[in-house]
Swiss-Prot record:
Compartments it resides in: Cytoplasm
EC number: 2.8.1.13
Molecular functions per Gene Ontology: ATP binding; tRNA binding; tRNA-uridine 2-sulfurtransferase activity
Stretches of the chain forming a coiled coil according to its record: none
Cited SUPFAM superfamilies: Adenine nucleotide alpha hydrolases-like
EC class (word): transferase
Region (Interaction with target base in tRNA): 103-105
The protein's name: tRNA-specific 2-thiouridylase MnmA
GO cellular component, one term: cytoplasm
Binding-site positions, ATP: 17-24, 43, 132
Region (Interaction with tRNA): 154-156, 316-317
Family: Belongs to the MnmA/TRMU family.
C-alpha cells in the first residue's frame, strides 16, 4: 500500500533527493498529488578537478531544476563532496588496494543519501525525505521494514540494505509501488524534461572513463604473472585490482597453443604472490562457492540469530533469491547455500531476505569452495 496522504491539519514537508533522473522527478510529482508540501534537493557528491564533467553533474542539476520549475517547487543544492571523499571514496580505494572489489553505491546510500542528506533536510525543516529508489517500506509493530520494490527488474533493496530502520522510517519511496514503464508514462503526462532520459549506470565518479584509467590515477599498478591452476605462466596482468572473480574479458591470453577454444576466466586473485589464477570454461569448479563468510552485517532491524536461520540471499545485484542458512560464528557470520554460487567476490555485498523483506547484509570476506554433498 502506498503511503497515505497527510491530513490537511498535518500537512508534512518532504524534501526529495532530486538526481536529475526520471525516478526522483516522478517521486516529487506523486508526493505533491498525495498532498505533501514538497521541495527538492540536488546533491553534488564529487568535485571534478580537470575541467571535464565526467559525472554530468551540471547536466543533471539543469534537469533537476527544469523539473522543479515545471512542477513549481523549490530546489535546494548541497555539496557533500567532502563527506563522500572521506566516507565513501577512501574506503573504495582501500578495498581495491587490498585486492577486493567494493560497491561504492551501498556506502553512498548509507553515508550520504540516508545520513548527510537526511540530516541536511531535517536542518531545513523537513518532516521526511524521499528518494526515487525502487523499494518500499512497511511500518509494523513499532518498527519500519524495508521491502523489495514491486518491479523485480528494478528492485534496489540490494543497494539499501545497510540503511537502518530509523532512517527508512523517515523516508518515502513513491515509485517503489510502480513499474518503470508506468513511471515514464507519468513523467510524459506531466511534460517533465526527464521523461525519456536514460537511466544512469556505473559509478558516478568514473563516468565515461575506462575504469583502469581512472583507478591508476589513485593507486599504483603492480603488474604480475597470470598462471593456470597447474602453475603454468601464460601471461601477465597489469594489476590485480583491475580484475574480479569470474571475469572473462580483458585478460589478453587467447590463442594459446594446446589450450583449446574455451574462454579463460579469473578464478583466484593470489594477493600474497600478486598472481592472477585463471582457468578455462564457464563451469570451472573453482568458479563456484558453497558458503561465504562476512565479518560484519548491517541489519535494517535487529534479528535473532541465536540459532541458524533459513533465509534467501543475493551475492550480486539482480541475482535471484538463493536459499541459504545463516549462522553467527565466533568471528562474524557464515551463509551456507543450498546450491553452488558462481563468482562469489570478496568486497561485494551479500544481502539477506525473508520473503519480500530486506533484512540487511554485509561485505563478503571469504568465499568457500563448493563441495557437492552428493
Amino acid at each position: 500500500m502506498r503511503d497515505p496522504a497527510p491530513s490537511d491539519t498535518q500537512k508534512k514537508r518532504v524534501i526529495v533527493g532530486m538526481s536529475g533522473g526520471v525516478d526522483s522527478s516522478v517521486s516529487a510529482v506523486l508526493l505533491m498529488e498525495q498532498g505533501y508540501e514538497v521541495e527538492g534537493l540536488f546533491m553534488k557528491n564529487w568535485e571534478e578537478d580537470d575541467g571535464t564533467e565526467y559525472c554530468t553533474a551540471m547536466d543533471d542539476l539543469a534537469d533537476a531544476q527544469a523539473v522543479c520549475d515545471k512542477i513549481g517547487i523549490k530546489l535546494h543544492t548541497a555539496n557533500f563532496a567532502a563527506e563522500y571523499w572521506d566516507n565513501v571514496f577512501e574506503h573504495f580505494l582501500a578495498e581495491y588496494k587490498a585486492g577486493r572489489t567494493p560497491n561504492p553505491d551501498i556506502l553512498c546510500n548509507r553515508e550520504i543519501k540516508f545520513k548527510a542528506f537526511l540530516d541536511y533536510a531535517m536542518m531545513l525543516g523537513a518532516d521526511l525525505i524521499a528518494t526515487g529508489h525502487y523499494v518500499r517500506r512497511r511500518d509494523i509493530d513499532g518498527r519500519t521494514e524495508l521491502l523489495k520494490g514491486l518491479d523485480p527488474n528494478k528492485d534496489q533493496s540490494y543497494f539499501l540494505h545497510a540503511v537502518g530502520g530509523e532512517q527508512i522510517a523517515k523516508t518515502l519511496f513513491p515509485v517503489g509501488e510502480l513499474e518503470k514503464p508506468e513511471v515514464r508514462k507519468i513523467a510524459e503526462k506531466h511534460g517533465l524534461a526527464t521523461a525519456k532520459k536514460k537511466d544512469s549506470t556505473g559509478i558516478c565518479f568514473i563516468g565515461e572513463r575506462r575504469f583502469s584509467d581512472f583507478l591508476k590515477q589513485y593507486l599504483p599498478a603492480q603488474p604480475g604473472e597470470i598462471k593456470t591452476t597447474d602453475g603454468e605462466v601464460i601471461g601477465r596482468h597489469h594489476g590485480l585490482m583491475y580484475h574480479t572473480i569470474g571475469q572473462r574479458q580483458g585478460l589478453g591470453i587467447g590463442g594459446l597453443k594446446d589450450a583449446g577454444e574455451e574462454p579463460w576466466y579469473v578464478l583466484v586473485k593470489d594477493l600474497d604472490n600478486n598472481v592472477l589464477i585463471v582457468g578455462q570454461g564457464n563451469e570451472h569448479p573453482l568458479l563456484f562457492s558453497g558458503a561465504l563468510l562476512a565479518s560484519e552485517i548491517y541489519w535494517v532491524n535487529p534479528i535473532d540469530l541465536s540459532t541458524p536461520r533459513r533465509l534467501t540471499a543475493k551475492v550480486r545485484y539482480r541475482q535471484g533469491d538463493q536459499p541459504c542458512t545463516l549462522e553467527k560464528t565466533a568471528t562474524g557470520y557464515r551463509a551456507t547455500f543450498d546450491d553452488p554460487q558462481r563468482a562469489v567476490t570478496p568486497g561485494q555485498s551479500v544481502v539477506f531476505y525473508d520473503g519480500e523483506i530486506c533484512l540487511g547484509g554485509g561485505v563478503i570476506e571469504v568465499a568457500e569452495a563448493w563441495s557437492n554433498p552428493a
